[in-house]
Amino acid sequence: MQLNSTEISDLIKQRIEQFEVVSEARNEGTIVAVSDGIIRINGLADVMQGEMIELPGNRYAIALNLERDSVGAVVMGSYAGLAEGVKVKTTGRILEVPVGRGLLGRVLNTLGEPIDGKGPVDNDGYSPIEVIAPGVIERQSVDEPVQTGYKTVDSMIPIGRGQRELVIGDRQTGKTALAIDAIINQKESGIKCVYVAIGQKASTIANVVRKLEEHGALANTIVVVATASEAAALQYLAPYSGCSMGEYFRDRGEDALIVYDDLSKQAVAYRQISLLLKRPPGREAYPGDVFYLHSRLLERASRVNANYVEKFTKGAVTGKTGSLTALPIIETQAGDVSAFVPTNVISITDGQIFLETDLFNSGLRPAVNPGISVSRVGGAAQTKIIKKLSGGIRTALAQYRELAAFSQFASDLDDATRAQLEHGERVTELMKQKQYAPMSVAAQAVVIYAAEKGYLKSVALNKVGHFEAALLSFMNSEYAALMTNINATGDYNADIEGEIKAALDKFVATQTW
C-alpha cells in the first residue's frame, strides 16, 4: 500500500495533535558557569529562594537568583573542583544551624561547626537562620536594664533588654572594646551572650576569645566567626546564624545579648555577592535591598511577652518574658555618619553610641560623645538609683563643652562660669574608664553621687582617678553591706542616700587619695 502526500500530511497532523507535553519537575541541575564563588545552574525546575543546593564533596550553595532559565547560587566555602557540567541537587531545606545551651563556651563558624578544637557541639536541635521577627502583639515594652559596666553608657545612654543600640565610630575608636566589656559584665547577670565576628582577622578574634576566657565570660558566650579570608557568602550569613542561636534563649523565657561586629563588613560582603549575581547596583554600589538586609536581622532582637514564650514552649515555660538585645557595630569612614549603611542602621535601631577619634586620641576612653549619643527606649529600663543620680551628668557635660569653646576667647570669667567649667572638667575626667574593668551598679552610683553633690570640688583634676579608686576601695571594705544592697535592689531612698552621704563624708575626711 502506497500513501500519497496528503495522507502523510494528515497523519502527521493527527500525531501532533495527540502528542502531550508532560512537564517533569526535576530536582537535579547542571552547572553551566562558575566564577568568583557564584555558580549558574540550568535544569532546576523546583527550587526556592534561599534553598540549600547540594554540591559534590558534601558542599552546599544557596539559591539567591531565580531567573527564567537558570538559577544563580552562591557557594558556601571553597568552590575548587566545581566546573561546567557538574550535577547538583536541590535539598528542599533552608539553611539551619545548631542551637542550644551546649553551644555556650564554643567558637563556631557560620554553619555552626566547631572551630575551637574542643570536639563536636552538644546541640538541642536546629533552627533556620532566616526567621520572621515577632509581631507587635507578641512583644512587650522594654523595662529591664542591661548593665554594660560603663559609667558613661549606663548613666547617660542606658540600654534595656530587647533594645537595639548601635555602636558607631571610625576604626580604632574602641567599638569592639565597649561591646566585649558589655559581654564580660554579664557573667553574673544570667544574660547569655553571642558574639558574631564578621570579616575580621583571625588573630584579632583569637585575642577576643582569649580575653573572654581570662575574665570568665566565655562559658556564658557563643562566638560565631566568619573571618576576612572566608567566602563572602559566609560573612553575609554569619549574623543570621548568630541571631538564631540567640533566639533559642529568647524564645524560652531567658535573656540574651548579641553583638554584631561589624555590620559594615556584612554589607560589603552582600554587595560583592549582589554585584557578582549581576543585580543592579544603587547608591554606593549597594543593591536596592541593603536596608532590608539589616532591618530583618535587627527586628529579631526584641522583648517577647509571656504568652509568646508559653505558646512557643507549648506550656513548658509559663509567666516568663524573653529578650534578645542587639549591639550592632558600624564602622564609619572619617566620621561620616551620613553614608548609606550608617544612616540605614541608625534609622533601624533604638539609639546609638557615637565614638569619636578626637576624644579617643585626647585620652577620653570610652570615647563616647554624649551630645549626639542617645538611647530612645532605655530610659524606661534604667536602674532606679542611677536614673535618680545621673540626671545632671549629661547637662554638666553639655554645658562644659559649650563653655570650654567659649572660654578660649574670653579673657576673664565670672565665678559661676568658672565653677561650671571646673565641675565639667572633673565629670569628664570621672567618665574615663579602663578596658576590661566594668563597674557594678553600686560603684557607679557612689561615684556619680560624689560628682553630683560636689565632693570633687576640692580634688585636683589629675587626682580624680585616684580619688575614684580609693573611694571604691573604701566603700567595698567599710560599707560592703550597703554596696551589696544597692547591687541587689537598685533602689534609691532617703535611707540609702543618708548612708552614701555619711560614707563619703567619712572618706573625704581621711584624705587618702
UniProtKB/Swiss-Prot annotation:
Q: What is the residue range of the signal peptide feature? A: none
UniProt entry keywords in alphabetical sequence: ATP synthesis, ATP-binding, Cell inner membrane, Cell membrane, CF(1), Hydrogen ion transport, Ion transport, Membrane, Nucleotide-binding, Translocase, Transport
> Which EC number(s) does UniProt give?
7.1.2.2
Catalyzed chemical reaction(s) = ATP + H2O + 4 H(+)(in) = ADP + phosphate + 5 H(+)(out)
In the bilayer, the protein is annotated as:
Peripheral membrane protein
> According to its UniProt record, where is this protein located?
Cell inner membrane
* Bilayer-spanning residue ranges: none
Q: Where is it found, in Gene Ontology cellular component terms? A: plasma membrane; proton-transporting ATP synthase complex
Which molecular function GO terms apply here?
A: ADP binding; ATP binding; proton-transporting ATP synthase activity, rotational mechanism
Q: Where does ATP bind?
A: G169, D170, R171, Q172, T173, G174, K175, T176
Give the site residues for Required for activity.
Answer: S373
The record's annotation in PANTHER family points to: ATP SYNTHASE SUBUNIT ALPHA, MITOCHONDRIAL
Which proteins does it associate with, and in what oligomeric form?
F-type ATPases have 2 components, CF(1) - the catalytic core - and CF(0) - the membrane proton channel. CF(1) has five subunits: alpha(3), beta(3), gamma(1), delta(1), epsilon(1). CF(0) has three main subunits: a(1), b(2) and c(9-12). The alpha and beta chains form an alternating ring which encloses part of the gamma chain. CF(1) is attached to CF(0) by a central stalk formed by the gamma and epsilon chains, while a peripheral stalk is formed by the delta and b chains.
Q: Which purpose does this protein serve, as stated in its record? A: Produces ATP from ADP in the presence of a proton gradient across the membrane. The alpha chain is a regulatory subunit.
Instruction: Tell me which family the UniProt entry assigns to this protein.
Output: Belongs to the ATPase alpha/beta chains family.
What protein name is recorded for this chain?
Answer: ATP synthase subunit alpha
Native organism: Shewanella denitrificans (strain OS217 / ATCC BAA-1090 / DSM 15013)
Gene, per the UniProt record: atpA
